Protein backbone atom coordinates (compact mmCIF):
# COMPACT_ATOMS: atom_id res chain seq x y z
CA UNK A 1 0.00 0.00 0.00
CA UNK A 2 1.41 3.37 -1.04
CA UNK A 3 1.07 5.86 1.85
CA UNK A 4 2.89 8.72 0.13
CA UNK A 5 -0.28 10.55 -1.00
CA UNK A 6 -1.50 10.49 2.61
CA UNK A 7 1.70 11.93 4.08
CA UNK A 8 0.76 15.65 3.71
CA UNK A 9 -2.65 14.99 5.28
CA UNK A 10 -1.10 13.14 8.21
CA UNK A 11 1.39 15.94 8.79
CA UNK A 12 -1.42 18.50 8.77
CA UNK A 13 -3.43 16.49 11.31
CA UNK A 14 -0.40 16.04 13.56
CA UNK A 15 0.39 19.76 13.39
CA UNK A 16 -3.19 20.59 14.32
CA UNK A 17 -3.06 18.25 17.29
CA UNK A 18 0.19 19.78 18.50
CA UNK A 19 -1.48 23.22 18.63
CA UNK A 20 -4.35 22.07 20.86
CA UNK A 21 -4.10 22.69 24.61
CA UNK A 22 -3.27 19.51 26.55
CA UNK A 23 -6.15 17.42 27.87
CA UNK A 24 -7.10 18.55 31.38
CA UNK A 25 -10.03 19.20 33.70
CA UNK A 26 -11.64 22.57 34.30
CA UNK A 27 -12.35 22.51 38.05
CA UNK A 28 -9.37 24.69 38.99
CA UNK A 29 -9.57 27.16 36.11
CA UNK A 30 -10.24 30.85 36.53
CA UNK A 31 -10.75 33.96 34.42
CA UNK A 32 -9.16 37.36 35.01
CA UNK A 33 -10.75 40.43 33.42
CA UNK A 34 -8.28 42.88 31.84
CA UNK A 35 -10.62 45.84 31.71
CA UNK A 36 -8.55 48.28 29.64
CA UNK A 37 -7.83 45.96 26.71
CA UNK A 38 -11.02 43.97 26.27
CA UNK A 39 -9.11 40.80 27.07
CA UNK A 40 -9.14 38.04 29.67
CA UNK A 41 -6.57 35.64 31.01
CA UNK A 42 -7.38 31.99 31.67
CA UNK A 43 -5.78 30.96 34.96
CA UNK A 44 -4.52 27.65 36.33
CA UNK A 45 -5.34 27.77 40.03
CA UNK A 46 -3.19 24.78 40.93
CA UNK A 47 -0.01 25.91 39.21
CA UNK A 48 -0.73 29.60 39.91
CA UNK A 49 -0.03 30.43 36.27
CA UNK A 50 -1.73 32.01 33.27
CA UNK A 51 -2.60 29.52 30.52
CA UNK A 52 -3.68 31.96 27.83
CA UNK A 53 -4.82 35.48 27.01
CA UNK A 54 -7.98 35.78 24.91
CA UNK A 55 -8.70 39.11 23.23
CA UNK A 56 -11.65 40.69 21.45
CA UNK A 57 -14.26 40.72 24.22
CA UNK A 58 -15.21 44.40 23.86
CA UNK A 59 -15.78 46.89 26.69
CA UNK A 60 -14.95 45.14 29.96
CA UNK A 61 -15.01 48.25 32.17
CA UNK A 62 -17.76 46.77 34.36
CA UNK A 63 -17.57 43.15 33.30
CA UNK A 64 -18.76 40.10 35.17
CA UNK A 65 -19.23 36.47 34.24
CA UNK A 66 -20.81 33.15 35.16
CA UNK A 67 -19.78 29.57 34.43
CA UNK A 68 -21.55 26.67 32.77
CA UNK A 69 -22.47 23.86 35.12
CA UNK A 70 -19.73 21.61 33.66
CA UNK A 71 -17.26 24.45 34.32
CA UNK A 72 -15.94 24.40 30.77
CA UNK A 73 -17.46 27.66 29.55
CA UNK A 74 -17.58 31.19 30.94
CA UNK A 75 -20.24 33.67 29.84
CA UNK A 76 -18.79 37.17 29.95
CA UNK A 77 -21.11 40.19 30.21
CA UNK A 78 -19.55 43.37 28.78
CA UNK A 79 -20.61 46.95 29.38
CA UNK A 80 -21.08 47.42 25.62
CA UNK A 81 -23.89 44.85 25.53
CA UNK A 82 -21.58 42.05 24.48
CA UNK A 83 -22.28 38.47 25.56
CA UNK A 84 -19.27 36.22 25.01
CA UNK A 85 -19.16 32.45 25.46
CA UNK A 86 -15.56 31.60 26.33
CA UNK A 87 -14.22 28.05 25.99
CA UNK A 88 -11.77 27.63 28.88
CA UNK A 89 -10.32 24.35 27.61
CA UNK A 90 -9.86 25.37 23.97
CA UNK A 91 -8.76 28.82 25.21
CA UNK A 92 -10.80 30.75 22.66
CA UNK A 93 -14.09 32.55 22.09
CA UNK A 94 -16.75 30.00 21.22
CA UNK A 95 -19.55 32.47 20.40
CA UNK A 96 -20.11 36.20 20.80
CA UNK A 97 -22.95 38.63 20.11
CA UNK A 98 -23.99 42.19 20.91
CA UNK A 99 -27.39 41.81 22.57
CA UNK A 100 -27.92 45.34 23.92
CA UNK A 101 -26.49 48.83 24.10
CA UNK A 102 -25.41 49.03 27.74
CA UNK A 103 -25.33 46.00 30.04
CA UNK A 104 -24.65 45.61 33.72
CA UNK A 105 -24.39 41.88 34.45
CA UNK A 106 -26.01 38.51 34.04
CA UNK A 107 -26.84 35.12 35.53
CA UNK A 108 -27.19 31.46 34.56
CA UNK A 109 -30.24 29.37 35.41
CA UNK A 110 -30.33 26.61 37.99
CA UNK A 111 -30.24 23.90 35.31
CA UNK A 112 -27.54 25.70 33.32
CA UNK A 113 -29.70 25.90 30.20
CA UNK A 114 -30.43 29.64 30.16
CA UNK A 115 -28.19 32.71 30.37
CA UNK A 116 -29.87 36.01 31.27
CA UNK A 117 -28.45 39.51 30.73
CA UNK A 118 -29.63 42.72 32.43
CA UNK A 119 -29.62 45.84 30.30
CA UNK A 120 -29.63 49.59 30.79
CA UNK A 121 -30.29 49.99 27.05
CA UNK A 122 -32.80 48.80 26.11
CA UNK A 123 -34.06 48.53 29.66
CA UNK A 124 -34.96 44.94 30.40
CA UNK A 125 -33.66 41.38 30.49
CA UNK A 126 -32.79 39.11 27.58
CA UNK A 127 -32.52 35.36 28.03
CA UNK A 128 -30.45 33.11 25.77
CA UNK A 129 -29.86 29.42 25.19
CA UNK A 130 -26.53 28.71 26.91
CA UNK A 131 -25.43 26.29 24.18
CA UNK A 132 -26.23 28.31 21.06
CA UNK A 133 -26.71 31.86 22.42
CA UNK A 134 -29.99 32.01 20.51
CA UNK A 135 -32.59 34.36 22.02
CA UNK A 136 -35.15 32.49 24.14
CA UNK A 137 -37.08 35.33 25.79
CA UNK A 138 -37.08 39.11 26.03
CA UNK A 139 -38.50 40.84 29.11
CA UNK A 140 -38.92 44.62 28.64
CA UNK A 141 -38.76 46.64 31.84
CA UNK A 142 -41.41 49.17 32.89
CA UNK A 143 -41.84 52.08 30.49
CA UNK A 144 -41.00 55.37 32.20
CA UNK A 145 -43.80 57.99 32.16
CA UNK A 146 -43.27 60.71 29.57
CA UNK A 147 -39.99 59.19 28.36
CA UNK A 148 -38.98 57.18 25.34
CA UNK A 149 -37.19 54.49 27.35
CA UNK A 150 -37.66 51.71 29.86
CA UNK A 151 -36.32 51.49 33.38
CA UNK A 152 -32.74 50.31 33.72
CA UNK A 153 -32.30 46.81 35.14
CA UNK A 154 -29.75 45.93 37.84
CA UNK A 155 -29.09 43.25 40.44
CA UNK A 156 -29.89 40.23 38.26
CA UNK A 157 -29.35 36.88 40.03
CA UNK A 158 -30.36 33.28 39.57
CA UNK A 159 -32.63 31.73 42.19
CA UNK A 160 -33.79 28.19 42.98
CA UNK A 161 -36.78 26.92 41.03
CA UNK A 162 -35.45 27.99 37.62
CA UNK A 163 -36.03 31.66 38.44
CA UNK A 164 -34.25 34.93 37.79
CA UNK A 165 -34.73 37.91 40.12
CA UNK A 166 -33.82 41.51 39.27
CA UNK A 167 -34.45 45.14 40.22
CA UNK A 168 -35.65 48.10 38.15
CA UNK A 169 -33.58 51.15 39.06
CA UNK A 170 -35.76 53.95 37.69
CA UNK A 171 -39.19 52.59 38.59
CA UNK A 172 -38.34 51.12 42.02
CA UNK A 173 -39.43 47.53 41.44
CA UNK A 174 -38.30 43.93 41.95
CA UNK A 175 -39.37 41.27 39.45
CA UNK A 176 -39.24 37.47 39.48
CA UNK A 177 -39.06 35.70 36.11
CA UNK A 178 -40.01 32.03 36.57
CA UNK A 179 -38.91 29.69 33.75
CA UNK A 180 -39.86 26.45 35.52
CA UNK A 181 -42.75 25.79 33.12
CA UNK A 182 -40.92 26.48 29.86
CA UNK A 183 -39.36 29.27 27.84
CA UNK A 184 -42.19 31.76 28.38
CA UNK A 185 -41.56 33.21 31.83
CA UNK A 186 -44.18 33.81 34.48
CA UNK A 187 -43.53 37.30 35.85
CA UNK A 188 -44.22 38.46 39.41
CA UNK A 189 -43.79 42.21 39.98
CA UNK A 190 -43.29 44.02 43.28
CA UNK A 191 -43.76 47.79 43.01
CA UNK A 192 -42.84 50.70 45.32
CA UNK A 193 -39.99 48.79 46.95
CA UNK A 194 -37.86 51.93 47.48
CA UNK A 195 -36.05 54.62 45.53
CA UNK A 196 -33.46 53.62 42.96
CA UNK A 197 -32.39 50.06 43.79
CA UNK A 198 -28.82 50.09 42.47
CA UNK A 199 -27.53 46.58 43.17
CA UNK A 200 -28.63 43.37 44.82
CA UNK A 201 -27.56 40.03 46.21
CA UNK A 202 -29.09 36.68 47.00
CA UNK A 203 -28.24 34.81 50.20
CA UNK A 204 -26.13 31.67 49.72
CA UNK A 205 -29.13 29.43 50.41
CA UNK A 206 -31.17 31.25 47.77
CA UNK A 207 -33.85 32.40 50.19
CA UNK A 208 -33.41 36.17 50.51
CA UNK A 209 -33.04 38.70 47.71
CA UNK A 210 -31.68 42.01 49.04
CA UNK A 211 -31.69 45.24 47.00
CA UNK A 212 -29.68 48.28 48.07
CA UNK A 213 -31.31 51.67 47.61
CA UNK A 214 -29.37 54.59 46.17
CA UNK A 215 -32.19 57.13 46.57
CA UNK A 216 -32.82 56.52 50.27
CA UNK A 217 -31.49 54.61 53.25
CA UNK A 218 -32.42 51.02 53.99
CA UNK A 219 -32.68 47.88 51.91
CA UNK A 220 -35.53 46.03 50.24
CA UNK A 221 -35.76 42.34 51.15
CA UNK A 222 -37.80 39.68 49.35
CA UNK A 223 -38.22 36.25 50.96
CA UNK A 224 -38.24 33.87 47.98
CA UNK A 225 -39.67 31.09 50.14
CA UNK A 226 -42.70 33.31 50.76
CA UNK A 227 -42.95 35.85 47.91
CA UNK A 228 -46.65 36.25 48.71
CA UNK A 229 -45.59 38.25 51.77
CA UNK A 230 -44.16 40.94 49.53
CA UNK A 231 -41.07 43.12 49.93
CA UNK A 232 -40.18 44.49 53.35
CA UNK A 233 -37.76 47.21 54.40
CA UNK A 234 -34.78 46.15 56.51
CA UNK A 235 -31.66 47.90 57.80
CA UNK A 236 -33.36 51.28 57.90
CA UNK A 237 -30.11 53.11 58.67
CA UNK A 238 -28.08 51.42 55.92
CA UNK A 239 -26.95 53.98 53.35
CA UNK A 240 -25.43 57.43 53.26
CA UNK A 241 -27.54 58.78 56.12
CA UNK A 242 -29.05 62.20 56.61
CA UNK A 243 -25.60 63.78 56.45
CA UNK A 244 -24.66 63.01 52.85
CA UNK A 245 -21.09 61.81 53.16
CA UNK A 246 -18.79 61.67 50.14
CA UNK A 247 -18.92 58.17 48.68
CA UNK A 248 -15.89 57.37 46.53
CA UNK A 249 -17.33 54.07 45.32
CA UNK A 250 -20.67 52.49 46.14
CA UNK A 251 -19.94 49.06 47.62
CA UNK A 252 -21.01 46.06 45.60
CA UNK A 253 -23.77 44.19 47.37
CA UNK A 254 -22.33 41.02 45.86
CA UNK A 255 -19.39 41.86 48.12
CA UNK A 256 -21.46 41.16 51.21
CA UNK A 257 -20.55 37.93 52.95
CA UNK A 258 -22.28 35.58 55.35
CA UNK A 259 -20.21 33.59 57.85
CA UNK A 260 -22.24 31.18 59.98
CA UNK A 261 -25.13 33.31 61.32
CA UNK A 262 -23.41 36.65 60.74
CA UNK A 263 -23.51 38.93 57.72
CA UNK A 264 -20.57 41.29 57.18
CA UNK A 265 -21.55 44.36 55.19
CA UNK A 266 -19.55 47.33 53.82
CA UNK A 267 -20.85 50.59 55.31
CA UNK A 268 -21.67 53.27 52.72
CA UNK A 269 -19.44 56.34 53.08
CA UNK A 270 -18.02 55.20 56.43
CA UNK A 271 -14.79 53.47 57.42
CA UNK A 272 -16.65 50.53 58.88
CA UNK A 273 -17.78 46.98 58.24
CA UNK A 274 -21.20 46.37 59.74
CA UNK A 275 -22.09 43.06 61.37
CA UNK A 276 -25.67 41.79 61.15
CA UNK A 277 -27.51 38.84 62.61
CA UNK A 278 -28.35 36.91 59.43
CA UNK A 279 -31.45 35.46 61.08
CA UNK A 280 -33.28 38.74 61.69
CA UNK A 281 -31.05 41.17 59.72
CA UNK A 282 -30.47 43.48 62.67
CA UNK A 283 -27.12 45.16 63.24
CA UNK A 284 -25.04 43.73 66.09
CA UNK A 285 -21.65 45.44 65.66
CA UNK A 286 -19.59 47.91 63.61
CA UNK A 287 -15.91 47.22 62.93
CA UNK A 288 -13.61 50.19 62.28
CA UNK A 289 -11.44 49.64 59.21
CA UNK A 290 -8.85 51.52 57.15
CA UNK A 291 -11.15 53.11 54.56
CA UNK A 292 -14.48 52.88 52.75
CA UNK A 293 -15.02 49.15 52.11
CA UNK A 294 -15.86 47.89 48.64
CA UNK A 295 -15.74 44.08 48.83
CA UNK A 296 -16.14 42.15 52.08
CA UNK A 297 -15.40 38.47 51.50
CA UNK A 298 -15.18 35.43 53.73
CA UNK A 299 -12.57 32.71 53.56
CA UNK A 300 -14.44 29.50 52.65
CA UNK A 301 -14.10 28.16 56.22
CA UNK A 302 -15.74 31.39 57.53
CA UNK A 303 -12.83 32.04 59.92
CA UNK A 304 -11.58 35.24 58.29
CA UNK A 305 -13.16 38.23 56.55
CA UNK A 306 -11.09 40.02 53.88
CA UNK A 307 -11.85 43.65 52.97
CA UNK A 308 -10.60 45.98 50.25
CA UNK A 309 -11.22 49.71 49.98
CA UNK A 310 -12.09 52.63 47.74
CA UNK A 311 -9.59 55.37 46.85
CA UNK A 312 -7.48 56.72 48.54
CA UNK A 313 -7.06 53.58 50.67
CA UNK A 314 -7.16 51.13 47.79
CA UNK A 315 -3.59 49.96 48.34
CA UNK A 316 -4.66 48.01 51.43
CA UNK A 317 -6.47 44.80 52.30
CA UNK A 318 -7.50 44.12 55.88
CA UNK A 319 -8.17 40.74 57.47
CA UNK A 320 -10.81 40.46 60.22
CA UNK A 321 -11.31 37.62 62.70
CA UNK A 322 -14.95 36.56 62.21
CA UNK A 323 -15.30 35.49 65.84
CA UNK A 324 -13.74 38.43 67.71
CA UNK A 325 -14.38 41.07 65.01
CA UNK A 326 -10.81 42.33 65.42
CA UNK A 327 -8.63 43.45 62.49
CA UNK A 328 -5.77 40.95 62.69
CA UNK A 329 -3.67 42.13 59.74
CA UNK A 330 -3.33 45.00 57.28
CA UNK A 331 -1.77 43.92 53.98
CA UNK A 332 -0.44 46.24 51.30
CA UNK A 333 -0.56 44.41 47.96
CA UNK A 334 -0.05 47.65 46.00
CA UNK A 335 -1.94 50.54 44.41
CA UNK A 336 -5.42 49.98 43.04
CA UNK A 337 -6.62 46.74 44.62
CA UNK A 338 -9.90 46.06 42.81
CA UNK A 339 -11.01 42.51 43.51
CA UNK A 340 -10.31 39.35 45.50
CA UNK A 341 -11.24 35.72 44.89
CA UNK A 342 -10.66 32.68 47.08
CA UNK A 343 -9.93 29.26 45.67
CA UNK A 344 -12.74 26.79 46.22
CA UNK A 345 -11.24 25.27 49.38
CA UNK A 346 -9.68 28.49 50.61
CA UNK A 347 -5.96 27.69 50.37
CA UNK A 348 -5.37 30.72 48.13
CA UNK A 349 -6.74 34.21 47.67
CA UNK A 350 -6.11 35.97 44.36
CA UNK A 351 -5.91 39.78 44.36
CA UNK A 352 -5.98 42.11 41.33
CA UNK A 353 -3.73 45.16 41.71
CA UNK A 354 -4.71 47.39 38.81
CA UNK A 355 -2.18 50.22 39.07
CA UNK A 356 0.73 47.80 39.43
CA UNK A 357 -0.50 45.65 36.50
CA UNK A 358 -0.29 42.60 38.75
CA UNK A 359 -2.36 39.62 39.74
CA UNK A 360 -1.15 38.37 43.12
CA UNK A 361 -1.70 35.07 44.93
CA UNK A 362 -1.68 35.02 48.74
CA UNK A 363 -1.71 32.28 51.37
CA UNK A 364 -4.65 33.32 53.61
CA UNK A 365 -3.37 31.26 56.54
CA UNK A 366 0.21 32.53 56.67
CA UNK A 367 -0.86 35.92 55.22
CA UNK A 368 2.07 35.81 52.80
CA UNK A 369 2.24 36.45 49.07
CA UNK A 370 3.07 33.22 47.24
CA UNK A 371 2.83 34.25 43.60
CA UNK A 372 2.46 37.09 41.13
CA UNK A 373 1.52 37.33 37.45
CA UNK A 374 1.69 40.27 35.03
CA UNK A 375 -1.69 41.57 33.87
CA UNK A 376 -3.07 44.56 31.96
CA UNK A 377 -5.25 46.69 34.26
CA UNK A 378 -6.63 43.61 36.04
CA UNK A 379 -10.02 43.79 37.72
CA UNK A 380 -12.50 40.95 38.30
CA UNK A 381 -11.25 37.46 39.18
CA UNK A 382 -13.58 34.47 38.83
CA UNK A 383 -12.82 30.78 39.45
CA UNK A 384 -14.95 27.99 38.04
CA UNK A 385 -16.03 26.58 41.41
CA UNK A 386 -18.61 29.40 41.30
CA UNK A 387 -20.61 27.20 38.91
CA UNK A 388 -21.86 25.14 41.84
CA UNK A 389 -23.12 28.05 43.97
CA UNK A 390 -26.43 29.94 43.90
CA UNK A 391 -26.13 33.54 42.77
CA UNK A 392 -22.57 33.27 41.43
UniProtKB/Swiss-Prot annotation:
It comes from the Bacteria. The keyword Cytoplasm applies. One of its GO terms (cellular component) is cytoplasm. InterPro entries: Cyt_cd1_C_sf (IPR003143), Haem_d1_sf (IPR011048), Host-pathogen_enzymatic-act (IPR051200). The keyword rRNA processing does not apply. Keywords: Cytoplasm. Its main location: cytoplasm. It is found in: Cytoplasm. Required for the biosynthesis of heme d1 of nitrite reductase. Could have a dehydrogenase activity yielding sirohydrochlorin from precorrin-2 or dehydrogenation of propionate side chain C17. This is Protein NirF.
Amino acid sequence: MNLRPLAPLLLTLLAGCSQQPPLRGSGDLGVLIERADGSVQILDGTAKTSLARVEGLGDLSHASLVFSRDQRYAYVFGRDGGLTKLDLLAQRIDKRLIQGGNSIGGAISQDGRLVAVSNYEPGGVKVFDSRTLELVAEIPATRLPGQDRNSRVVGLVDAPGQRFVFSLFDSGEIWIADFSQGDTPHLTRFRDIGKQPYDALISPDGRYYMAGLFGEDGMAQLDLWHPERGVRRVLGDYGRGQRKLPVYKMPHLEGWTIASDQAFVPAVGHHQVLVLDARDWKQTDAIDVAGQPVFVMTRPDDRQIWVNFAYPDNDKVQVIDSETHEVIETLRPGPGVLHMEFSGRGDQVWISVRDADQLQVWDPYRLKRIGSLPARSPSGIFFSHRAQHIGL
